[in-house]
Amino acid sequence: QIWVFGGGPGAEVFLKNYREQVPKQWLNETLIIAIDGATRLLMKFDIVPDVIFSDLDGIRPKDLQKKAVQDAFLVVHAHGDNMDKIKLFTPILKQWAHLIATTQTESALPVINHGGFTDGDRALFLIDNFVLNKQPVFLFGYDFGSVVGSHSKPEYAEDKKANSMKATKMRFGRQLTEKLCSSSIAEYDIIACGERIHAKCEVSEIFNFNDFKNLYLDKQWRSS
């Protein structure tokens, strides 16, 4: 299975409520993907991501200097207003063993534009090139609401209401996510914890760990 942790508050709700009940074997057998600041969130709950997608505004240099994450594949996105971040992280990126560079403009190898708009949907556009038929992909923190998770930015101490520009970006992200999830050969499933998520693709509401356990086992059985 593939588990993707995004920037919405639902990711933290899931981990706070159910992290201790998730069997270690599940984590060992799952590809864990962190979207930007979700890297810090996962590490807080002693989960090391296998892949990190970031435009570098949700993480700090010291987050990538932790030995535990340095075997991860790091997908770094460059766009018009993060050149200062690129320069700040350059000493770390030069030493990174598994680095993929992406851009919002035309591809110029080895830098690629694989599609997508926000960090969350951009990650899905890349991994969808490698998924298997009926492979389960769970999306946590893909809430698409009016709230931005506290782990989205290092300077956030709590969840914040999205401003108008962020809300617009989230709307585009939701539309792209819906389109990809609905057309993929894999089985994408947005996990809703607490707040209801409105999306034109598969959404599973989790009210307790048994709900998630049954969903996990059902997806595992159907994909085998």
Predicted segments, located by residue:
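Buried, small/hydrophobic-residue-enriched core segments of structured protein domains
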Residues: 87, 98, 129, 139-145, ...
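Active-site metal-binding loops of divalent metal-dependent hydrolases
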Residues: 7-9, 56, 142
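N-terminal glycine-/serine-/threonine-rich phosphate-binding loop
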Residues: 1-40, 44, 50
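Glycine-rich phosphate/pyrophosphate-binding loops
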Residues: 48-50, 131-152
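N-terminal donor/sugar-recognition subdomains of glycan-related enzymes
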Residues: 1-21, 148-150, 155-224
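Acidic/Gly/His-enriched mid-domain segments of enzyme catalytic cores or analogous surface patches
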Residues: 30-31, 37-134
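Short beta-strand segments
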Residues: 4-6, 36, 77, 102, ...
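A structural signal for short, well-ordered beta-strand segments and their strand-loop junctions
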Residues: 101, 136-141, 189-193
